[in-house]
Design a protein with these regions (language model features):
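A generic short-segment signal for beta-strand/edge and adjacent turn/coil regions
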Residues: 8, 41, 51-56, 84, ...
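Active-site-adjacent loops and short helices of periplasmic peptidoglycan-processing enzymes
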Residues: 26-173, 177-186, 244
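Generic recognition of cysteine residues
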Residues: 17-18, 42, 237
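Residues in and immediately flanking transmembrane alpha helices
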Residues: 21-22, 81, 203, 278
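Domain-terminus/edge residues, biased toward the C-terminal soluble/receptor-binding domains
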Residues: 152-153, 164-280
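Sec-dependent N-terminal signal peptides of Gram-positive bacterial secreted proteins and lipoproteins
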Residues: 2-28
Length: 280
């Protein structure tokens, strides 16, 4: 073989490798960086929790009712889902939003937890905490222990519902990590993907509840959760999730007047990093 022929073969081989590389990348077509009005926001790929985009994602924020994602995690891992919910005057009198629990109601922890995630009931959050841990402070410790375990380093909980307390805080990045963990639990995914639900009481009657999450009802391809939030201190909050194929994106927005617009834009941006064949 002449040296010229060898050089030609090497060049052809290099060109073929380049073509294959470009062809693999060509399936992905990343969109322009998305805008947001959020004070803090974070987008992650739930497979490895890698941050795809963010805005002040490590800023300490009031998490409002996105807190209930951790409340659900701790409750789901308690082993008490089929036990009767403990409903105390403290729970019933908790500041709204409310699931409408009354003293004497008979309902399992599982059903109340589902209602809590759909309606964002603060009364249910307190009842869940007291059922699982005996008291709100004891439950908050369980929440903080779990946050530490998950690597949510800038998060501290003092209650299960997210009503404003300046010792109760998180970040968009931390909450994305927490939500990613939660979405790997099949029962959690079922709870937060419901637009409406007939909550079943132990005496046989049901109560129809509907979601506070407009994103879930938006028609966005793959939308499957997760949780809204609002307090005067926190502003409008949203943890949004969507799954296409084996890819799940999670976006968190804190203090965002345009959360319903930002969520689909950011999630679509996340999916644009991947070949369409991965999203089927």
């Amino acid at each position: 073989m002449t040296s010229l022929s060898l050089v030609k073969k090497v060049i052809i081989g290099m060109l073929m490798c380049c073509f294959m590389l470009v062809n693999n990348i060509a399936g992905a077509n990343p969109l322009p960086d998305p805008d947001t009005w959020a004070e803090s926001a974070c987008l992650i790929d739930a497979e490895d929790n890698g941050v795809l985009y963010g805005k002040d994602e490590d800023k300490i924020m009031h998490p409002a009712s996105t807190t209930k994602i951790m409340t659900a995690i701790v409750a789901l891992e308690s082993g008490k889902l089929d036990e009767p919910l403990v409903i105390t005057p403290e729970a019933v009198n908790t500041e709204p939003s409310s699931l409408g629990l009354r003293l004497g109601d008979k309902i399992t922890l599982r059903e109340a937890l589902t209602g809590m995630m759909i309606v964002s009931g603060n009364d249910a959050a307190v009842a869940v905490a007291q059922t699982v841990a005996g008291s709100v402070p004891a439950f908050a410790k369980m929440m903080n222990d779990k946050a530490k375990e998950l690597g949510a380093k800038n998060t501290h909980f003092v209650n299960p519902h997210g009503l404003t307390n300046y010792k109760h805080y998180s970040t968009a990045h931390d909450m994305a990590i927490i939500a990613s963990y939660a979405m790997k639990k099949p029962e959690f995914r079922q709870m937060v993907n419901k637009q409406a639900y007939n909550m079943k009481y132990m005496d046989g009657h049901t109560v129809y509840v509907t979601t506070t999450n407009r994103f879930l009802k938006s028609g966005f391809y793959g939308a499957n959760g997760i949780k809204t939030g609002f307090t005067n201190a926190a502003g409008d909050c949203l943890v949004a999730s969507a799954t296409r194929g084996k890819k799940t994106m999670i976006a968190v927005f804190y203090n965002d007047d345009y959360r319903w617009d930002d969520a689909p834009n950011w999630l679509e941006f996340g999916f644009s990093f991947y070949d369409k064949s991965e999203l089927k």
